[in-house]
Curated annotation (Swiss-Prot):
The lineage of its organism: Bacteria, Pseudomonadati, Pseudomonadota, Gammaproteobacteria, Enterobacterales. This is tRNA threonylcarbamoyladenosine dehydratase. Its EC number is 6.1.-.-. The keyword Transmembrane helix applies. One of its GO terms (molecular function) is ATP binding.
């Protein structure tokens, strides 16, 4: 059943309709999109979804806001430190659009619970997990069950958002997280390339050579390898910039919306 677009909704998202068209406005209002991982990439993806008029958004994460998230996460404000990221982001979405149906799942996706959390019938899933095994489990499940998904590679260690693009996961470069993810998909879930050398998984990544932090406080550009740092944690690993992490999230949302519109056009 289609969502009835209210006058208030139309006021908020008239600019969306003038850009994408009236049919797309209804498509977005009817959509239910899940963001898994509400951090440096996922928080910005959730923001973009809310401000585009997506009717239902599910946020999955069990992490809390940390003061060290300040450089890259939209919900990392002084008064939010120590609060659950998904809950804080959900309240922000309700402030953006009180009519958005927001669901919070206070948990981390694992190989054991991925089927439970992906059984909702999402219009699209945006994977912003930064740990390899749960990320692989989510991708493998969605791929096997034909749930539309876009994944994101590592967003740390980069300063140039103009080098971000979307390709098949098999084709990424300069991305240790994506490289490790390919290995885990193959070894743990039997996901291998097809005859065209593709995995059939859309991935947001950057062609930029990574900047690695050094123990003496300097930084150094090195060729990315699967053995390099893979995460942006609170104490070590890659540094990060909002300009890059946010763009990863925005590109993921843009790609998902484009795919949704193309599918709707094919179905008439």
């Amino acid at each position: 059943m289609s969502v009835v677009i209210s006058d208030a909704w139309r006021q908020r998202f008239g600019g969306t309709a003038r850009l994408y068209g009236e049919k797309a406005l209804q498509l977005f209002a009817d959509a239910h999109i899940c963001v898994v991982g509400i951090g440096g990439v996922g928080s910005w993806a959730a923001e973009a979804l809310a401000r585009t008029g997506i009717g239902a958004i599910t946020l999955i994460d069990m992490d809390d806001v940390c003061v060290t998230n300040t450089n890259r996460q939209i919900h990392a404000l002084r008064d939010n430190v120590g609060l659950a990221k998904a809950e804080v982001m959900a309240e922000r979405i309700r402030q953006i659009n009180p009519e958005c149906r927001v669901t919070v799942v206070d948990d981390f996706v694992t190989p054991d619970n991925v089927a439970q959390y992906m059984s909702v019938g999402y219009s699209y899933v945006i994977d912003a997990i930064d740990s390899v095994r749960p990320k692989a489990a989510l991708i493998a499940y969605c791929r096997r069950n034909k749930i539309p998904l876009v994944t994101t590679g590592g967003a740390g260690g980069q300063i140039d958002p103009t080098q971000i693009q979307v390709t098949d996961l098999a084709k990424t470069i300069q991305d240790p997280l994506a490289a490790k993810l390919r290995e885990r998909l193959k070894s743990d879930f039997g996901v291998v390339k097809n005859s065209k050398g593709k995995l059939g998984v859309d991935c947001v990544f950057s062609t930029e050579a990574l900047v690695y932090p050094q123990s003496d406080g300097t930084v150094c550009a090195m060729k990315a390898t699967a053995e390099g740092p893979k995460r942006m944690d609170c104490a070590s690993g890659f540094g990060a910039a909002t300009m890059v992490t946010a763009t990863f999230g925005f590109v993921a949302v843009s790609h998902a919306l484009k795919k949704m519109m193309a599918k709707a056009a094919r179905q008439g």
